[in-house]
């Protein structure tokens, strides 16, 4: 009887753990909860020059608008030392949890993980002139996040083949925060 009870507890633990993990991924994603202000925390890519200073994918997120079958992104980029605001709309694709946006080529992205209140992690694949690269971003509701969340993001990057030397912590850079207003 004790063995049966132990197996039942183990089974429930595994089911609950799986449900918790699944609640923050594609199938069970509540996109409406992503609406609001966000800050760029960490960015990673297998094509580092895209995320370095003056790289086209070094963007500083400000706000995500949840629209009908699309997401609006208000962000800033730095050009010649000046912060410039952009707004792009990403449209839902037929794939579950996937979106498409035109920016420095075509981009498909998914939301890998979120807890809605503190962080969201995106995975993007860019297609331009027959070439592709990956980009991963960690956004936070606050200007910085705990080292635990950053480490979870780094491990997710590694799982996607992006090495730690291609991960940049943007909290240590000028993120155009003064322009947020």
UniProtKB/Swiss-Prot annotation:
Q: What is its main location?
A: secreted
Q: Where is carbohydrate linked to this protein?
A: 54
Question: What Pfam families does the annotation carry?
Answer: Lipocalin
Cellular component terms (Gene Ontology)? cytosol; extracellular space; nucleus
CDD domains cross-referenced by the UniProt entry: lipocalin_MUP-like
Q: Which residues form the signal peptide?
A: 1-19
Keyword set for this entry?
Answer: Allergen, Behavior, Cytoplasm, Disulfide bond, Glycoprotein, Pheromone-binding, Secreted, Signal, Transport
Membrane-spanning residues: none
Q: Where in the cell is it found?
A: Secreted
Query: Which signals induce this protein?
Result: Synthesis of this protein in the hepatic parenchymal cells is induced in vivo by androgens, glucocorticoids, growth hormone, and insulin, and inhibited by estrogens.
Which GO molecular function terms does the record list? Answer: insulin receptor activity; odorant binding; pheromone binding; small molecule binding
**Disulfide linkage:** 83-176
Any one GO biological process: locomotor rhythm
Q: In which tissues is it expressed?
A: Abundant in the urine of adult male rats but absent from that of females.
Q: Which SUPFAM superfamilies match?
A: Lipocalins
What role is this protein assigned? Major urinary proteins (Mups) bind and release pheromones. They may also protect pheromones from oxidation. In this context, they play a role in the regulation of social behaviors, such as aggression, mating, pup-suckling, territory establishment and dominance. Acts as a kairomone, detected by the prey vomeronasal organ and inducing fear reactions in mice.
PANTHER family tied to this protein: LIPOCALIN, MAJOR URINARY PROTEIN 1-RELATED
The UniProt family comment states: Belongs to the calycin superfamily. Lipocalin family.
Which protein, by its recorded name, is this?
Answer: Major urinary protein
Task: Please spell out the taxonomic lineage of the organism that makes this protein.
Answer: Eukaryota, Metazoa, Chordata, Craniata, Vertebrata
């Amino acid at each position: 009887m004790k063995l049966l009870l132990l197996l039942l507890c183990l089974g429930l633990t595994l089911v609950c753990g799986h449900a918790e993990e699944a609640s923050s991924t594609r199938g069970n994603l509540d996109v409406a909860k992503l609406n609001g202000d966000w800050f760029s925390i960490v960015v990673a890519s297998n094509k580092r020059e895209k995320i370095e200073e003056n790289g086209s994918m070094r963007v500083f997120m400000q706000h995500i608008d949840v629209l009908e079958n699309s997401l609006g992104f208000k962000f800033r980029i730095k050009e010649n030392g000046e912060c410039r605001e952009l707004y792009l709309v990403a449209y839902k694709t037929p794939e579950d949890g996937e979106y498409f946006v035109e920016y420095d080529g075509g981009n498909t992205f998914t939301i890998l993980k979120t807890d809605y209140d503190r962080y969201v992690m995106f995975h993007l694949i860019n297609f331009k002139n027959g070439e592709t690269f990956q980009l991963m971003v960690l956004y936070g509701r606050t200007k910085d996040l705990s080292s635990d969340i950053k480490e979870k993001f780094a491990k997710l990057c590694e799982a996607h083949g992006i090495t730690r030397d291609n991960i940049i912590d943007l909290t240590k850079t000028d993120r155009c925060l003064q322009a947020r207003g």
